């Protein structure tokens, strides 16, 4: 449980930094690239928080991000709509790892406000549901 609390604190800082950049109306290329890196880190730390939460409080062993997302829906942490967006976010995260394409970076940056809101909601729901 201590590991989960530490990860939640990291997730809080990461999501806050993502939200800070995502709230802008437009970005320089450097800001956009920084925002994508913040997204990558925020996503990674948050799905791992959710994985720890599932293991500790629900006795569910989910190894992959997509499985963690689906299990979060099954137990009520994410709605069907949030799950759909989280799965898309997971796919986008995978693409950022394997590809750098200017067009994709522009498309992804347009989704950052929504992704930031979803990550914030997911984080708060995990915190709220913790005993």
What residues fall within each predicted segment?
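Solvent-exposed interaction patches of small proteins and small membrane subunits
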Residues: 1-131
């Amino acid at each position: 449980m201590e590991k989960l609390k530490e990860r939640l604190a990291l997730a809080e800082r990461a999501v806050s930094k993502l939200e800070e950049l995502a709230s802008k109306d437009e970005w320089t290329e450097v800001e956009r690239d920084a925002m994508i890196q913040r997204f990558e880190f925020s996503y990674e730390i948050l799905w791992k928080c959710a994985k720890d939460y599932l293991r500790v409080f629900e006795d569910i062993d989910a190894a992959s991000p997509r499985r963690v997302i689906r299990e979060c829906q099954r137990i009520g942490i994410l709605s069907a709509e949030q799950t759909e967006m989280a799965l898309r976010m997971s796919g986008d995260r995978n693409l950022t790892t394997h590809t750098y394409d200017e067009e994709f970076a522009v498309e992804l940056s347009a989704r950052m406000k929504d992704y930031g809101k979803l990550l914030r909601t997911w984080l708060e729901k995990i915190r709220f549901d913790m005993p």
